Each structure stands twice: as structure tokens, then as C-alpha cells.
Amino acid sequence: MYKRILVAIENSAADQTILAHVTDLARLTGAELLLVHVADGFAARHFDDLKLRESEEMKADRAYLEGLKRNLVAQGLTVEYELAKGDPATELIRMVDARAVDLVAMSTHGHRFVSDVIRGTTADKVRHLVKVPVLLLRKQ
């Protein structure tokens, strides 16, 4: 059924909501989990152009991903992670093709009013532009 599930990680409490669902799904299908967090601060968005070093925030994001991976591997799951840089929707969409993902799992949030109306949400962009199923769970 599924071989590789991309799990969008926010470094927030919402991560536990989405992970609770996808870990069970991964066990049932034997799928690998690909944990992806997209750092989107100034340093991350201009990392390559300005030849910057990882910011403290990016280092903390990487440590968070490593901790999640360690915990999930201890539960018997196959897990990889990637800390991407830039626009979250663009990077998640790119990674679906680049990493042969066959399911995207991500949490959604309540509306941020003007920002969502003007730019749309990351979840909306991803679900409309990828060619694989997308599992959306509301943050609890």
C-alpha cells in the first residue's frame, strides 16, 4: 500500500497528533516514515545564497528531528528525516517527487485570517499540487 510516508513536522504539539496516526499506519503497511521540517526564517530562506552557517534555530530543529527519529526507531519503525530550507509548501511538494513519497501526512491549523486569504495555507497548496494522497489532521 504505502512505502514512504512524508510527515510534515512543525516542531510543535501538533506533531504528536500527526505522529500518533502515521506510526500506526506505518506499522500496518511497513512504510518508512520521512520526517520533514522546513525551516523558513530569514537565515534558512537565504542559506545557500548568503553561504550562511546553520542558525541556532536550525540546529534546534535538527536536534528535534533527530530526537523524534530516535524515539520512532526504538519503536521498531524505519525513519529518515530531512531539514529543508525555504517556503514550506514549495519544499514539501518538491520532496514528494524527489523522495518517491506515496502519502503526505500533515496537520492543519485554524485560520490566520488575512494571511490565509492572501497566500493560502501550506496544507492547501500541498494538497492541490501533489499527485499522491494527503492525510490532513486538525491540530488538537
Which residues does each predicted region cover?
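Conserved beta-strand positions in the Rossmann-like core of class I SAM-dependent methyltransferases
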Residues: L34, E80, L135
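Short, hinge-like loop/turn segments at secondary-structure boundaries
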Residues: K51-E54, A98-R99, T122-A123
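Short secondary-structure boundary segments
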Residues: H37-V38, S107-H109, R138-K139
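A short acidic, glycine-rich active-site loop
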Residues: L52-A63
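Small/aliphatic-rich secondary-structure junction motif
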Residues: K3-D49
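Structural beta-alpha unit
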Residues: R70-V104
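Glycine-rich, Arg-bearing micro-motifs that act as flexible, cationic patches
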Residues: M106-H128
